[in-house]
Amino acid sequence: MESYLVDTYQGVPYTAAVQTDLVEKDQLPARLTVWFPLFQTNTPPTVLLEQLKTLTITTLYTASQNGPILKVNASAQGAAMSALPKSFDVSASVALDDYSKLEFDKLTVCELKAVYLTTMKPYGMVSKFVNSAKAVGKKTHDLIALCDFLDLEKGVPVTIPAYIKSVSIKESESATVEAAIGGEADQAITQARIAPYAGLIMIMTMNNPKGIFKKLGAGVQVIVELGAYVQAESISRICRNWSHQGTRYVLKSR
């Protein structure tokens, strides 16, 4: 079984993001990716990861008002597992490659193939921005981060566009604001990491944000959901080999 740790914060308590790769134990097994709700813990990451390897997980494919879901129940051995969410729902789209193999309303035991743990800052220092351009109110522009990575193994550059936030800017001010973004961005971001959670996430650690970035908060780690950005690649390979080269920001008019 594969296990992998992405350590973006060294301290306690910390926020733990746990993702598992599963295979159903039935006659037509589906491969699933299930991520646990974020939780806070004081357990050293290496100890937590070892105890996560004892996970037993069952899933039930059913329906909800928001579409097909998997009802997940989990148990594991070890004192650290008291903080782990034991019962929760995830979107059935996690079963990306084997959607047709899921059997409706059947409780299925799953075999654990891989477990991934990402450590982040404590509650209150982690902000989650879903990769969606939907916003409430009359917004005129979207702030987009263009995160440049280098695949160290293949020597191939990769750019990931990520929606950060929607803002209202007067047309007469748009040129001035856009020109200021470059300097503000130099102060705003210190690092970006790819981590396995909800498929893939990008964790951006904000330093001393100004201007358009100031609402994100200094010292905050921003989570941007990427989903299954690269389905054909090993998630752990991406996490090990994609090195952040820099981040550019653009304002996109709506």
Swiss-Prot record:
It is a peripheral membrane protein. InterPro entries: Matrix_Pneumo_C (IPR055461), MATRX_N_pneumovirus (IPR005056), Pneu_matrix_N (IPR043062). One of its GO terms (cellular component) is host cell cytoplasm. It is found in: Virion; Host cytoplasm; Host nucleus; Host cell membrane. Keywords: Host cell membrane, Host cytoplasm, Host membrane, Host nucleus, Host-virus interaction, Membrane, Viral matrix protein, Virion. One of its GO terms (biological process) is virion assembly. The keyword Metal-binding does not apply. The keyword Membrane applies. Pfam families: Matrix_Pneumo_C, Matrix_Pneumo_N. One of its GO terms (molecular function) is structural constituent of virion. Coiled coil: none annotated. Has a crucial role in virus assembly and budding. The matrix interacts with the RNP complex and this association serves two functions: facilitate virion assembly and inhibit the viral transcriptase activity. Early in infection, M is localized to the nucleus and may inhibit host cell transcription. Later on, M can associate with lipid rafts supposely by interacting with the cytoskeleton and with the cytoplasmic tail of glycoprotein G. The binding of M to host membrane is stabilized by the surface expression of the viral glycoproteins. Belongs to the paramyxoviruses M protein family. Interacts with glycoprotein G (via N-terminus), and protein N. Interacts with protein M2-1; this interaction mediates the association between proteins M and N. This is Matrix protein. It comes from Avian metapneumovirus (isolate Canada goose/Minnesota/15a/2001) (AMPV). The gene is M.
